[in-house]
Amino acid sequence: SQWSEQAPIAQWARLAAAGGNSIRTPMRDRRLEGFAIYPYARRPDGRYDLNRWNDEYWQRFERLLRETARRNIVVQIEVWDRFDFTDHTSEKHWQAHPYNPANNVNYTASQSGLAVLYPDHPGLNRQPFFFTTPHQRHNRTLLAYQQRFVDKLLEHSLGYDHVLYCIDNETNGEAAWAHYWADYIRKRARQRDREVQVTEMWGDWRLTGAEHRRTFDHPELFDFVEVSQNTHKSGQRQWDDLAAARAYLSGQPRPMNTVKVYGADGSDFGQTDQKGIEGFWIQLLGGSAAVRFHRPDAGLGLGDTAVASLRAARKLNERVPLWSVQPAN
């Protein structure tokens, strides 16, 4: 949703032509390569006003929803991303973030409970932004702005029927946070007579780990499950862990989505293009309802190799609908 007009439209057309019909859309809160913008209005003094919107941000989001709907492309939104709220990487995203009390006119550090610097990896869970809900620390100051953002997002997205909702990107935060926002989104949707599909994406690479039980064990809150982190593995281990998740869910079956397949030459994870190709097919043949290559350099994106895999998968599915068969081992 952060790109200017022509670049994403060309990519969506390329995706649809290859037989693809699913994209990932994090509601990015970081400046990337000069084209990304924030959802809030910026004042002449350089500070943000969290009570005023940046219209361009929301116009881009609306365009994404409109153009993907025209092409029958499913949009999986990620509402929050912990990496946007940290200074751990060289980009130091938190230093420029509108929620940083140094960067807005709406609250101070003492009023919000937010520091102006968070140098640790977000996996250490030292960012109070993700502890605001009533069954956590109930930070009313921050929660009001978070709710306002989600309400604005839903104002746009609930007008469409091709949107899935994921609370976070690869989090290891508290279950109470995910449960609150899943319930919040569902209630807002029902107020508009809409039904929504919601999940959470946990960071644990082990699908049999306790984190994933937080979604697996709560079908009343989570309509599908996210298994992207399984693709950090490869070969038999990747296959076996996906099979274990599928078996665990068999009592109350729900779709398993893989919105990020890792693996590309030059990846920070030391992976290869071949690993990405194999990972895509393992997830697809193992029962994933949706499979998408992660962006470069962590994945193959929508390059020629990815397009070839999409076309092959579509041809296979035309001959043997994959939902009509089961893995044999």
Language-model segment annotations:
Residues T171-N172, W202-W205, G209, L221-E278, ...:
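Active-site clefts of carbohydrate-active enzymes
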Residues R71, R192, G251-Q252, G286:
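Helix C-cap/helix->beta junction micro-motif
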Residues S1-F222, S234:
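Active-site mouth of glycoside hydrolases
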Residues M256, G263-G266, T272-N329:
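Aromatic- and carboxylate-lined catalytic core of secreted/periplasmic carbohydrate-active enzymes
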Residues L158, E170, N230, S288, ...:
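Residue-level marker of positions within ordered structural domains that often coincide
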Residues W58-F61, V150, A178, A182, ...:
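Amphipathic alpha-helical segments in well-structured domains
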Residues E67, Y248, I282-Q283:
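Hydrophobic/aromatic ligand-binding patch that stacks against planar heteroaromatic rings
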Residues G20, I73, R254, S288-A289:
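Short glycine/serine/threonine/alanine-rich loop segments
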